[in-house]
Amino acid sequence: MIAQAAPPSRAPRLIPFFNPLAMRLLRRGRLMGPNALLSVRGRKSGEMRTTPVALVELDGRRWIIGTFGDTNWVRNLRAAAEGIITVGNRRETVQALELSREDAAGFFATTLKPYVGGMPLGLGRLILGMLGARDIIDDPARAAAHRPVFELTPGSPRSR
């Protein structure tokens, strides 16, 4: 049996237009659902880079998902292993640990699926569909092959 490759993840065309607006609103402390700003040092430039991300918070634990695959922020976070999460007016340095493919699939199936399913009016599934990420719910193992997940914990790895 030949393993089927995961489809490449691409951001929908609206994302380059939406992200600057989202960043402005989030920087002003406006909450936009489960969104936050992630600031992480560029792996080549060394400069801080900031992008809006979906932040999943459940039972005292936090995760962010590379919905569009191996993007620049994902590669930067892998290299730095730490960043700054800003939610409203609260900024926090966090350590980021990328989940293995198996753990990411388990996260999608047992944590994210009920989380998304609990959103009113089917909003979670609608948003995932608009982002081209419905496979996170429909086929977690396949999604985990090309949608990285990072668990965030307080503090910096250098300070431990």
What are the functions of these language-model segments?
Residues 1-28:
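Extreme N-terminal tail/first-helix region
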Residues 23-24, 50-51, 136-138:
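A generic local structural motif
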Residues 26-28, 62-75:
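Covalent nucleotidyltransferase core used to form phosphodiester bonds in nucleic acids
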Residues 31-35, 146-147:
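A short helix-loop-beta-strand connector motif used in the catalytic cores of GNAT acetyltransferases and
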Residues 33-68:
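Short beta-strand segments
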Residues 64, 159-160:
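Short, well-ordered strand-loop elements centered on a beta-strand within folded domains, enriched
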Residues 68-150, 155-158:
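Short, structured beta-strand-loop surface elements
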